[in-house]
């Protein structure tokens, strides 16, 4: 036997290298085979519900790192709630209708207009489901736990029927109407868009300054006067029917030198406009308030059949332009509102493809709207005063990335204005985890217009509306419920398979159809109505869920998307928000803080992270960032997270190895019998337990990460485990001192593994497989530990906080001695402490082997003044010299009792007593040489 064999060197097969990329899929299959999700649900049956409702990602393409961050966050919450006394089911969902899928099929060569619509929709459905299953596998690879066999998908018959019923209730309450308001119109998609389908980019446009000649000045202005107008959309002049001024803005009538014409502009802008137009020696002839100009009539710049009326509008400002805007009610929301209020014609001169129509005039007909500037300039002639290129923020179709226009077309709307206050009141009852989130959603609802819910596309849920022979729209409770029942059995494709009369209740009649003939609506619903109905399609319809949900968690862009549409439909139907809490996240940016883009080549695919690091590192990264704001991710950042993971893993490996001979049922030492330092570490660990439990409850992942890493690096690695080897390796295997420390080790190991499970389930299960005395076969089936408190806890914490200060001062003294070449390692030191009453009281309270805690071979405590050569730090003085004696071959301390024993071992008296007591046979035979 060799002397080293008398040491209790921890042994474990738990590998230092995690091998996550190859091991994770194996563990995930094991969990699936063991039906862990179902078993967890069974364990939680009867407990209070916590329902996190999954906002459905769009079923197209592989998941990106933003998806990963969002879904890992959801998984951490679901797992932590499931292990904290809640019944927390997770039903993943997917959004499957809409234009992107039609665009994919078009790229694949599918010609929609050349094939049967039902067959086309079948192709859309097949493609959408293929994407659902692909993304499902992507999410499962992240280590997510959920009901993967009972997903919710917006194209299933039960979901579509639930959506129709949401629409029906809104129709019954009078919230659905048809109108010809201007809407966001995407010529590139040939469809109306909702606000949530718009994104803003900078666009360079030609702006024109031109003049309308006064035709009837109402006794205020003469007919040789021109009102100066500014526009950034020259094509809309073809539909201009008025000029809008601000009622309280001051306007001036001016005449520049050399001009026979007189002009009206905003007084505040006269100086800048004079410079822009090249006016000199401008004479101000009169000043008017905007309201004085109301109902003056001007000529259209070139259309002699059209007069343009001066009207008042609150949207007019003097921030730019001339303080006067031309008004085309068919091409703008503000224009429409003031135009309708003043009886202006709603003219639309652009078709669905962005092409100018015949009513724009023969010079314009057939031109693309954005190419008509030269023609407009030609038509304006000497009425054009200036033109310039401006860069401004402009709405784009979020899918095609093309600019859109406002365009008045007949559409179906949900009248938000009819129940706006009810929605705002509902927002006040929701808990927002970021106050700005509440303000943002509140302001969006307060300021938004009615919701355009119709789309001129094919792949979606049909609007369940019929038309009588006289054109009357039919959407009664009876007809809508009948359609819902048909969809429930056959799916929405039946709408296209059957004639209108076969979709109506048997024997249905309507006074507007004396011949019994009916037509059906061909528009489909906005996809935001699809996902915005999920509270009904999922929460209400599934018995293991609750409505409203406890939590909606999505990216901050969903304040204008899913949070918004779900809120509107839920309040419209039931008067309540569909969620009790909202937690939003920022976007994942690259390492430089730039937006990720395939064109920039700075994207990071979750699959690439899984191959290089493992999903576990991605999960840990999610907790290492403040996801309420935009966050950064790169392979370098993930490498740093991987290093943190390595430290966590190796620390826990040390605990596994050094409890391998510990049977908790037999070897645990009661708290009251622990040493002071062990009590301290137990208390500190329970503080960590409370911090982490509270942070899980509040969804504060970064708090968990910081607290965990700090505990492992500072409390364990830099202190407790730093001197632990002198106990667990050196002392007798069954000695009280060793068992005391092992008791703490094992308690920390078991509980920290449970605490890590929601974040690092793969690693936690791997550790758990080495804990043979734990009864649950999977740690995921256990409960999170409860934080304990102990007698005299605060007193113990205060004592050890003071000792940590003392220890820090001692370490400074040792470092100075090391720099002076007095010692090398701290174990070579003889440390003398010149104590005062404070230090004396402290060390008595610590009641531990202080030399062991400081990792020095010899410690002397002297009462009285320190010599001049002593090193003083704050109010403690030290001297450091090399310890006397020889190095013990067993404990590596320098000890004056170290000597060669009769059994061929050069060891100190303390080690000799341990060896002689526990290894009598080896002592009798003598130890082998090293």
UniProtKB/Swiss-Prot annotation:
InterPro entries registered for this protein in UniProt: aa-tRNA-synth_I_CS, aa-tRNA-synth_Ia, Anticodon_Ile_BEm, Ile-tRNA-ligase, Ile-tRNA-ligase_type1, Ile-tRNA_ligase, M/V/L/I-tRNA-synth_anticd-bd, Rossmann-like_a/b/a_fold
Binding site for L-isoleucyl-5'-AMP: 554
Positions of short motif 'HIGH' region: 57-67
Catalysed reactions listed for this entry: tRNA(Ile) + L-isoleucine + ATP = L-isoleucyl-tRNA(Ile) + AMP + diphosphate
Molecular-function annotations in GO: aminoacyl-tRNA deacylase activity; ATP binding; isoleucine-tRNA ligase activity; tRNA binding; zinc ion binding
Keywords: Aminoacyl-tRNA synthetase, ATP-binding, Cytoplasm, Ligase, Metal-binding, Nucleotide-binding, Protein biosynthesis, Zinc
Cysteine disulfide links: none
One record GO biological process: isoleucyl-tRNA aminoacylation
EC code(s) of this entry: 6.1.1.5
Record localization: Cytoplasm
PANTHER family: ISOLEUCINE--TRNA LIGASE, MITOCHONDRIAL, SOLEUCYL-TRNA SYNTHETASE
Family indicated by similarity: Belongs to the class-I aminoacyl-tRNA synthetase family. IleS type 1 subfamily.
Subunit structure and binding partners: Monomer.
This protein's domain notes: IleRS has two distinct active sites: one for aminoacylation and one for editing. The misactivated valine is translocated from the active site to the editing site, which sterically excludes the correctly activated isoleucine. The single editing site contains two valyl binding pockets, one specific for each substrate (Val-AMP or Val-tRNA(Ile)).
NCBIfam families xrefs: ileS
UniProt-recorded name of the protein: Isoleucine--tRNA ligase
Species assigned in the record: Streptococcus pneumoniae (strain 70585)
Gene responsible for this protein: ileS
């Amino acid at each position: 036997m060799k002397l080293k064999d008398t040491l209790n060197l921890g042994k474990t097969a738990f590998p230092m290298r995690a091998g996550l990329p190859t091991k994770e899929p194996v563990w995930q299959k094991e969990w699936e085979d063991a039906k862990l999700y179902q078993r967890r649900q069974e364990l939680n049956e009867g407990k209070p519900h916590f329902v996190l409702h999954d906002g459905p990602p769009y079923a197209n393409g592989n998941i990106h790192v933003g998806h990963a961050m969002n879904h890992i966050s959801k998984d951490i919450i679901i797992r932590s709630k499931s292990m904290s006394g809640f019944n927390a089911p997770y039903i993943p969902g997917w959004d499957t209708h809409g234009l992107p899928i039609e665009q994919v099929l078009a790229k694949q060569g599918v010609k929609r207009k050349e094939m049967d619509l039902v067959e086309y929709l079948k192709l859309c459905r097949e493609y959408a489901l293929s994407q659902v299953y692909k993304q499902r596998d992507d999410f499962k690879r992240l280590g997510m736990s959920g009901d993967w066999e009972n997903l919710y998908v917006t194209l299933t018959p039960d979901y579509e029927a639930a959506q129709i019923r949401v629409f029906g209730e809104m129709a019954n309450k009078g919230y659905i109407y048809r109108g010809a308001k201007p809407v966001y119109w995407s010529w590139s998609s040939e469809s109306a868009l909702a606000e949530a389908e718009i994104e803003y980019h900078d666009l360079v446009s030609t702006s024109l300054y031109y003049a309308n000649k006064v035709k009837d000045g109402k006794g205020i202005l003469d007919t040789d006067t021109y009102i100066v107008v500014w526009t950034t959309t020259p094509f809309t002049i073809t539909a201009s029917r008025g000029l809008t001024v601000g009622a309280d803005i001051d306007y001036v009538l001016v005449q520049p030198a050399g001009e026979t014409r007189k002009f009206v502009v905003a007084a505040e802008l006269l100086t800048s406009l004079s410079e822009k137009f090249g006016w000199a020696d401008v004479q101000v002839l009169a000043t008017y308030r905007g309201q004085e100009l109301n109902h003056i009539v001007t000529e259209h710049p070139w259309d002699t059949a059209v007069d343009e009326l001066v009207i008042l509008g609150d949207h007019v400002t003097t921030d730019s332009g001339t303080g006067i805007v031309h008004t085309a009610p068919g091409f703008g929301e503000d224009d429409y509102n003031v135009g309708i209020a003043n009886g202006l014609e709603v003219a639309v001169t652009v078709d669905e493809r962005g092409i100018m129509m015949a009513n724009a005039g023969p010079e314009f007909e057939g031109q693309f709207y954005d190419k008509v500037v030269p023609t407009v300039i030609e038509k304006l002639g000497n009425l054009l005063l200036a033109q310039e290129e401006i860069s401004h923020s402009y709405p784009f179709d979020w899918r095609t990335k093309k600019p859109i226009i406002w365009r008045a077309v007949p559409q179906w709307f949900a009248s938000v204005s009819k129940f706006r206050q009810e929605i705002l009141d509902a927002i006040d009852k929701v808990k927002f985890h970021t106050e700005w989130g509440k303000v943002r959603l509140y302001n969006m609802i307060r300021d938004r217009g009615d919701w355009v819910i119709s789309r001129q596309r094919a792949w979606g849920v049909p609007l369940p509306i019929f038309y009588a022979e006289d054109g009357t729209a039919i959407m009664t409770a009876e007809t809508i419920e009948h359609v819902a029942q048909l969809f429930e059995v056959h799916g929405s494709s039946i709408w296209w398979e059957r004639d209108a009369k076969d979709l109506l209740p048997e024997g249905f009649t309507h006074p507007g159809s004396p011949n019994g003939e009916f037509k059906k609506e061909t528009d489909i619903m906005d996809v935001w109505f699809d996902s915005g109905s999920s509270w009904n399609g999922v929460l209400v319809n599934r018995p293991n869920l609750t409505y409203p949900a406890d939590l909606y968690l999505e990216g901050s862009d969903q304040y204008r998307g899913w949070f918004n549409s779900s809120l509107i439909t839920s309040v419209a139907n039931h008067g309540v928000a569909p969620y009790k809490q909202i937690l939003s996240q920022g976007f994942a940016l690259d390492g430089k803080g730039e937006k990720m883009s395939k064109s920039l080549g700075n994207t990071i695919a979750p699959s690439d992270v899984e191959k290089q690091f493992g999903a576990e590192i991605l999960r840990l990264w999610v907790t290492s960032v403040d996801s309420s704001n935009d966050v950064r991710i790169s392979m370098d950042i993930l490498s740093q997270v991987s290093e943190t993971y390595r430290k966590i893993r190796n620390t826990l490996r040390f605990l596994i190895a050094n409890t391998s001979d510990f049977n908790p049922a037999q070897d645990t030492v009661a708290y009251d019998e622990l040493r002071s330092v062990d009590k301290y570490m137990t208390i500190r660990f329970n503080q960590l337990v409370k911090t982490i439990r509270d942070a899980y409850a509040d969804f504060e992942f970064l708090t968990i990460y910081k607290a965990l890493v700090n505990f492992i690096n500072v409390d364990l690695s830099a202190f407790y485990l730093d001197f632990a080897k002198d106990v667990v390796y050196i002392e007798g295997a069954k000695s009280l001192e060793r068992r005391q420390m092992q008791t703490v080790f094992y308690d920390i190991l078991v509980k920290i593994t449970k605490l890590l499970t929601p974040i690092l389930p793969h690693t936690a299960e791997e550790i758990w497989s080495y804990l043979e005395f734990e009864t649950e076969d999977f740690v995921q089936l256990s409960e999170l530990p409860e934080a304990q408190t102990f007698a005299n806890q605060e007193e113990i914490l205060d004592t050890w906080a003071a000792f940590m200060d003392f220890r820090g001062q001692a370490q400074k003294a040792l470092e100075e001695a090391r720099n002076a070449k007095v010692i090398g390692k701290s174990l070579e030191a003889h440390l003398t402490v010149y104590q005062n009453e404070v230090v004396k009281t402290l060390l008595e309270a610590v009641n531990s082997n202080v030399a062991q805690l400081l990792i020095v071979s010899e410690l002397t405590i002297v009462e009285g003044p320190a010599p001049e050569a002593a090193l003083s730090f704050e109010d403690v003085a030290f001297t450091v010299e090399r310890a006397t004696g020889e190095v013990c071959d067993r404990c590596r301390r320098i000890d004056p009792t170290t000597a060669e024993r009769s059994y061929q071992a050069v060891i100190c008296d303390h080690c000799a007593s341990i060896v002689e007591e526990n290894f009598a046979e080896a002592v009798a035979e003598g130890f082998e040489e090293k």
